[in-house]
Amino acid sequence: MQAIIDAEQSFKFPVLVGDIGGTNARFSILVDSNAEPKEFPVLQTADYATIDEAIQHAILDQTAIQPRSVILAVAGPVDGDEIDLTNCDWVVRPKKMIADLGFEDVTVLNDFEAQALAVVSLEGHHMEQIGGKPEEAVATRVVLGPGTGLGVAGLVCTRHAWVPVPGEGGHIDIGPRTERDYQIFPHIERIEGRVTGEQILSGRGLRNLYLGICAADKITPTLETPVDITSAGLDGSNPQAAETLDLFATYLGRLAGDLALIFMAHGGVYLSGGIPVRILSALKAGSFRAAFEDKAPNKAIMRDIPVRVITYQLAALTGLSAFARTPSRFEVSTEGRRWRMRR
């Protein structure tokens, strides 16, 4: 599947690709279109005041390779010459990067746009399937990622290429359905009166859900962090934490199923980010898939749609690297999202 591409859409190598999340930042360098990526240690965004400082000290100072092009995936909308990141204090200023760091070309995409590019670029062993049939080769796909926030994107196949469809799906309304839900939801923290997907299906959402369960049960919470809640839920040492994971899996299944119906995603639903990998055993226990398929009158359709957990930490970099190597494989608009050195 190849689309016609002009020189304006290609990238000059070496190319630095970066996945900038709310907590972690990952980078690698492609020396040319055929080379294996040169990887660097994962960075904590809180350890650096700016993204420029992080790139200079953790990347450029550690290699003799000077990238000519940069492709970044960031958690947040790409709008204007100063790009604020969601859940992180960094601000991406492409013009300043070109002036100060020696780059010729900087492109900034949405982080889940990169995840969408990855789902048709990863190897099979980088994913674990939870139910459904094998995916249809050129069918629409959906990526859903609970992590620091909740990312959502689609991936649609045209006649010539894959088209990522990023959005802000993590901020849709999510509501109660069962009697137990109605006991818990009054205690879930709201944003201007709304319970959004991100208020439950994220790291902080996991804690919100746990606190809601404790409030519904009229007990004092004893676990403080999402990590503590996850650990206690997985080993069964805390009943409320165990229910938190079960309901998290259920609510994630409901939302994933809704998105699968919206996109008619016979190419599959892909779960990315650190949380699905960490709670993989809970996702495979049954509640997730049951909620995913419970979409009458379309249960038969839902039974066939595969769900895959992306287990590879560098998935977004894989997607960005695929775009850098073969941009003709994808239709990605860079208008207003690409900056070049003036000559």
Curated annotation (Swiss-Prot):
Positions of ATP binding: 18-23
Which InterPro entries does UniProt cross-reference here? ATPase_NBD, Bacterial_glucokinase, Glucokinase
In its UniProt record, which GO terms are filed under biological process?
A: glycolytic process
Query: What does the record give under GO molecular function?
Result: ATP binding; D-glucose binding; glucokinase activity
* A cellular component annotation (GO) from this entry: cytosol
Going by the entry's taxonomy, the superkingdom of the source organism is recorded as: Bacteria
The record's SUPFAM superfamilies line, in alphabetical order, gives: Actin-like ATPase domain
The record's listing under Pfam families reads: Glucokinase (PF02685)
Top enzyme category: transferase
Keywords of this entry: ATP-binding, Cytoplasm, Glycolysis, Kinase, Nucleotide-binding, Transferase
Localization terms from the record = Cytoplasm
Please give the catalytic activity noted in the UniProt record.
D-glucose + ATP = D-glucose 6-phosphate + ADP + H(+)
Where it mainly occurs, coarsely classed, is: cytoplasm
Q: What is its EC number?
A: 2.7.1.2
What family is it from? Belongs to the bacterial glucokinase family.
| PANTHER family in the cross-refs | GLUCOKINASE (PTHR47690:SF1)
Q: What is this protein called?
A: Glucokinase
Gene of this entry: glk
